[in-house]
Amino acid sequence: MNEQVLVTGGSGFLGMRIISELLKDGYEVRTTLRSLDKKKQVIKTLNDHHIKTEKLSFVEADLSKDEHWNEAMKDCKYVLSVASPVFFDIPEDETEVIRPAIEGIQRILRAAEKANVKRVVMTSNFGAVGFSNKDQSSISTEENWTNQDEPGLSAYEKSKLLAEKAAWDFVKNKDNDLEFATINPVAMLGPSLDSHVSGSFNIIKNLVDGSLKRVPNIPLNVVDVRDVARLHILAMTTPEANNQRFIATADGQISMPEIAQLIKHQRPELATQTSTKKLPNFVLGLGAKFNKEAKEGKLLL
């Protein structure tokens, strides 16, 4: 197979998993890294998992800069836009989180259009879809959008929401043949190829290390990173996927207390500090008035 795919953010939890699946499928893969210092580690990690990397190439490119994106897109049929702007400290002003996310996807779409890329698949998230649906009897679908002024919506979630909206606006307002689709994963867990994990792993970390003395009875939707990677490839290659959004989730929900119980039963050696005592919902509601994490947690009740 000579088709070339660009994957942005190749050193990340999801990005590296997508690269591994594409290489196993026989694609030529190019990936972007903010620094090529990570190139050897990415190759080593993939090789350690018995994945051949002869068809993998690298370009140094940053979502916040115009340089090198034309080079990254050259001869690519597909682009999987996985990377998000990186912040080591979350700025106080949410616009400093939102603006780079919007400008980043616009930068990718402009370069893809210029390079005559066939289709771009963007990694969005479920926070852009279902956080304004308060009716427990109704089902959130790809037709739904979260209200950007939803109380408790974090700057990160808002940045993903507004970046996806900006992407759809770009595609729909352009007179070109660029195809587009989005993947909207819920809490993404599963095995990592290296030490990089998703932000959703903070849920597990806080349960394992005893940070949560009482566990909020929050229902969660989760999805395996391997399924999300495969869904990106299906959205890339399936003709009917053009102009569509796809929620990535496993069947049903699991609560945080249920996750705590699973850790205790399945990995007791990790659960010496794991609490299974439930935090009453009204306490979480009270805490939401003063605590950012509690406010974000209340959003999921």
Regions found by a protein language model. Give the residues of each.
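Mid/C-terminal beta-alpha module of Rossmann-like enzyme folds, strongest
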Residues: L231-E296
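NAD(P)H-binding glycine-rich loop region in Rossmannoid oxidoreductase-like domains
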Residues: L36-D37, L46-E103
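N-terminal Rossmann NAD(P)H-binding glycine-rich loop of SDR-like oxidoreductase domains
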Residues: Q4-Y27, T32
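Alpha-helical substrate-binding/gating segment
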Residues: I204-K213, I218-F246, D251
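Conserved Rossmann-fold NAD(P)-dependent oxidoreductase catalytic core, especially the SDR/UDP-sugar
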Residues: S81, P85, I90-Y156
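Glycine/proline-rich active-site loop of Rossmann-fold NAD(P)-dependent oxidoreductases
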Residues: K174-L178, G190-I203, A235-F246, L270
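Glycine-rich "substrate-gating" loop/helix at the edge of Rossmann-like oxidoreductase active sites
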Residues: G152-A155, G190-H196, R214-R226
